[in-house]
Regions:
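Short proline/glycine-enriched turn/loop motifs at strand-loop junctions of beta-rich domains
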Residues: 89-94, 131
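Noncatalytic modules at the cell exterior or secretory-pathway interfaces
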Residues: 81-84, 127-142
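Short, surface-exposed beta-strand/strand-loop-strand elements in extracellular ectodomains
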Residues: 93-107, 113
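Non-cytosolic beta-sheet module surface loops
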Residues: 76-77, 86-91, 140-142
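Short beta-strand segments within Ig-like beta-sandwich modules, predominantly Fibronectin type-III
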Residues: 113-119
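Short strand-edge motifs at loop-to-beta-strand transitions and within beta-strands
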Residues: 121-124
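Edge beta-strands of jelly-roll/beta-sandwich modules across compartments, strongly enriched
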Residues: 95, 140-160
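N-terminal prepro-regions of secreted/extracellular proteins
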Residues: 1-72
Length: 161
């Protein structure tokens, strides 16, 4: 009887260890988006999007650290990748782009500080959580003091690069 109890104890311990093994081996996936890479205008134009949106924003002059800006392009992620570009901004040669999680109304939480990008080129972010709301905040170190009336384009897509 003692041998049976000992055998069952060892068997139960082995079964418990086996059930824990897959979760212990699982890799931690990034929970926050990060810049996948900066992309050229040609690369941006070649993206086959799931969704596309365009709009206008008054692009303000940035502070010295590039962290201020105006919120624009709120969206609910329908794919885990998004690219954003300022297509045109009279008087500007570059822009800063920051990605936020949440709504413009609630202010969101910053998930990527900022990237300085040439007008016409874009920033591509990956690791978005599908169904979550995001928006961008933009500014420009080369904008006139009164700002610049800029046009933007946003594309969501499955990974293509």
């Amino acid at each position: 009887m003692k041998k049976v109890k000992k055998f069952l104890s060892v068997l139960c311990a082995a079964c418990m260890a086996i059930t824990l093994l897959p979760s212990a081996m699982a890799a931690d996936l990034p929970s926050e988006p990060n810049v996948y890479r900066l992309i050229s205008a040609q690369e941006f134009n070649s993206i086959a999007p799931r969704s596309t949106a365009t709009g206008r924003v008054m692009l303000p002059r940035s502070n010295s650290s590039g962290t201020n800006g105006v919120a624009c392009s709120e969206f609910v992620a329908d794919e885990s990748n998004v690219s954003f570009t300022i297509d045109s901004a009279p008087g500007c040669t570059n822009y800063n782009v920051q990605l936020y999680l949440g709504t413009i109304k609630d202010g969101g939480s910053q998930v990527y500080l900022f990237e300085s990008v040439n007008i016409g080129a874009g920033a591509s972010f990956s690791g978005l959580e599908i169904g979550k709301t995001y928006f961008f905040k933009v500014s420009s170190s080369t904008a006139p003091s009164s700002g610049s009336n800029a046009s933007w384009t946003r594309k969501t897509y499955p990974c293509q690069f």
